[in-house]
Amino acid sequence: MSKSHSEAGSAFIQTQQLHAAMADTFLEHMCRLDIDSAPITARNTGIICTIGPASRSVETLKEMIKSGMNVARMNFSHGTHEYHAETIKNVRTATESFASDPILYRPVAVALDTKGPEIRTGLIKGSGTAEVELKKGATLKITLDNAYMEKCDENILWLDYKNICKVVDVGSKVYVDDGLISLQVKQKGPDFLVTEVENGGFLGSKKGVNLPGAAVDLPAVSEKDIQDLKFGVEQDVDMVFASFIRKAADVHEVRKILGEKGKNIKIISKIENHEGVRRFDEILEASDGIMVARGDLGIEIPAEKVFLAQKMIIGRCNRAGKPVICATQMLESMIKKPRPTRAEGSDVANAVLDGADCIMLSGETAKGDYPLEAVRMQHLIAREAEAAMFHRKLFEELARSSSHSTDLMEAMAMGSVEASYKCLAAALIVLTESGRSAHQVARYRPRAPIIAVTRNHQTARQAHLYRGIFPVVCKDPVQEAWAEDVDLRVNLAMNVGKARGFFKKGDVVIVLTGWRPGSGFTNTMRVVPVP
């Protein structure tokens, strides 16, 4: 499977950690990692950025796309439809500003993140950005009286969950703002709770509330979610991040609301509570992909167990060949500082090493002081971590875990990735209509980037969900002769790869094409030197 280092020669562009990637044992692999080994130019992991006040101007979005943003996430827990419509328009304007050059054009996907059946606090009186300090030991009254909806302060807090007094008991815990603030219930009334502040801190407006252990009876898809999903279909979003998915039926419900018109929208289920982890397999089967939403997960299950859930979820998604996103607090300190903590750098790298297809930024890009730096940081860390994957072992295990199927595309994908290791290919070029061929290749985790050429804009945008796929949109009209059309698209991929520094003249690339037009006919693999 491996050539010796010297044999690969200096012409080979991808020296990144090759020695370590081809080790025989995991210990040997770790021992061979080298801090002076340069990573490959391409980054294989997708970067998802939440767009908010700090990043929604067209100019900032252009810079974020240049810095490496692949998917723009709209968080529907905040903002009106008009606000999000404008943000989506800005994202598309920024994306299309690069469209004049087919080689530099990067399709950016739009993701709608539903509010889901969550509980949130009201507005702190004053302004939307006002905060109040809750001191440890102080008494805080939680009320359902709508008179306080926009008048919360350090003494009284309004919540939007009408049944809270029925599901919590005296002695129960109430967590606010990803668990940063904890309250203990001391007394219950018909429409209020009296609590004592256990862990204090500064509280802002519209923060999430968790009631671990309580049987919260909220519907999987709220009335607001239904309106938001319909709005998403109108706006032609590429994917939905569905919050608080607890079982397969929840996913089917989201799919039903998206309807015929939204049937191509990918549904990514967010796993953020104990039931979601426990019933993970049925959720995975019903979904197009998964997000490990570590914020709420870390309150609903003990904080020290979150990494177990993360590894289990990523492992099962990799095995099933479905995309998985790691999210929440990845570079949290960069909201206020230009550099991440060492722990955060490690966290991003380890999510990539675990096998995440995408990594996500939330507050870092939505409201932080350093949105561009955060994107660049994720880009740099992801590239280094990808090079340090134990590729040889990973490929063997993925190949072994895939069942013997009559699906020819799967055999092609596995064969092309194995060939790419054997001949140290600098890239794999895949011509794809629906994107399926490229997704199958990505499933086997080649070291080299997969340049997927398609004429379908949505296929290109959604391809960012899969690790390693670099989508290229072919805007040229279809040629009459099939062979000429194939050559046209392969040449476009060659030009993009050279312009991006993925490979240079004389390197070897693997080209996967179909033998006739249409989806589902990819069956030809060639090993081609770069002209």
From Swiss-Prot:
Organism: Oryctolagus cuniculus
PTM sites of type Phosphothreonine: 41, 195
Protein's pathway: Carbohydrate degradation; glycolysis; pyruvate from D-glyceraldehyde 3-phosphate: step 5/5
Pfam family, one: PK
MF terms in GO: ATP binding; magnesium ion binding; mRNA binding; potassium ion binding; protein tyrosine kinase activity; pyruvate kinase activity
Modified residues (Phosphoserine): 37, 97, 100, 127
Protein name, entry field: Pyruvate kinase PKM
Other comments on record: There are 4 isozymes of pyruvate kinase in mammals (L, R, M1, M2) encoded by 2 different genes: PKLR and PKM. The L and R isozymes are generated from the PKLR by differential splicing of RNA; the M1 and M2 forms are produced from the PKM gene by differential splicing. L type is major isozyme in the liver, R is found in red cells, M1 is the main form in muscle, heart and brain, and M2 is found in early fetal tissues as well as in most cancer cells.
Residues that coordinate or bind L-serine: 70, 106, 464
Keywords noted in UniProt: Acetylation, Allosteric enzyme, ATP-binding, Cytoplasm, Glycolysis, Isopeptide bond, Kinase, Magnesium, Metal-binding, Methylation, Nucleotide-binding, Nucleus, Phosphoprotein, Potassium, Pyruvate, S-nitrosylation, Transferase, Translation regulation, Ubl conjugation
A single BP term in Gene Ontology: positive regulation of sprouting angiogenesis
General function of this protein: Catalyzes the final rate-limiting step of glycolysis by mediating the transfer of a phosphoryl group from phosphoenolpyruvate (PEP) to ADP, generating ATP. The ratio between the highly active tetrameric form and nearly inactive dimeric form determines whether glucose carbons are channeled to biosynthetic processes or used for glycolytic ATP production. The transition between the 2 forms contributes to the control of glycolysis and is important for tumor cell proliferation and survival.
Record: residues binding ATP: 75-78, 120, 207
